[in-house]
Amino acid sequence: SSYGVTYVKDESELLDALEIAFECDEKALVEERLVGTEITVGVLGDPPRALPIVEILPQEGSEFYDLDVKYIDPTLVHRIPAAISPKDYHRAEEYAVAAHEALGCKGFSRSDFIVGEHGTTILETNTIPGMTDTSLFPDEARHAGIPFSAVCDELIHIALEGAEE
């Protein structure tokens, strides 16, 4: 949920950012920032299928899709389907389903990507994506014509099948 995540513009900001990160955990990950279009791809079902892709539109005053944008001021502006090329759209769907399967996810997941000059890069896979009123996964399902109650029914069915095995 972006706890402890900070965007630094130059090396002078790195130590302060690491202090914030170490308040959340004893380990920290430092990565190069990728420039491009931020998208997220929900995966639902067994067999898993990609849901319509969400494009996360940049918010004024926010460097990235951070904790404040997600939960404190949840006025996230996003577009479904994402305005990316058909090639990038298909690639992101394939990567999201492949990540879901490779990680052994059951029922649902949501993978985040940056699409840019570098290609389509997966940032992370959320194995238990948010399911609140402001969460992206239920919105993706709605755009696929799947009401929230049907998503819950499908997840319960998958869990019960797994319990029988």
Positions of predicted regions on the chain:
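Short beta-strand-to-turn element immediately C-terminal to the catalytic PLP-Schiff-base lysine
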Residues: 6-10, 43-46, 116, 123, ...
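Phosphate/diphosphate-binding glycine-rich loops and adjacent basic-rich segments that engage nucleotide
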Residues: 1-9, 17
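Short, flexible active-site loop motifs that bind/organize anionic cofactors or intermediates
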Residues: 3-4, 79, 141
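Phosphate-binding site of ATP-dependent enzymes
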Residues: 11-94, 121
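Gly/Ser/Thr-rich beta-alpha loop segments that engage phosphate groups in nucleotides
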Residues: 6, 38, 131-132
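Short beta->alpha junction loops/turns
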Residues: 10-11, 46, 108, 130
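ATP-dependent carboxylate activation and anion-phosphoryl transfer catalytic cores
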Residues: 85-165
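Glycine- and other small-residue-rich loops at beta-strand/loop junctions that grip anionic moieties
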Residues: 6, 31-32, 111
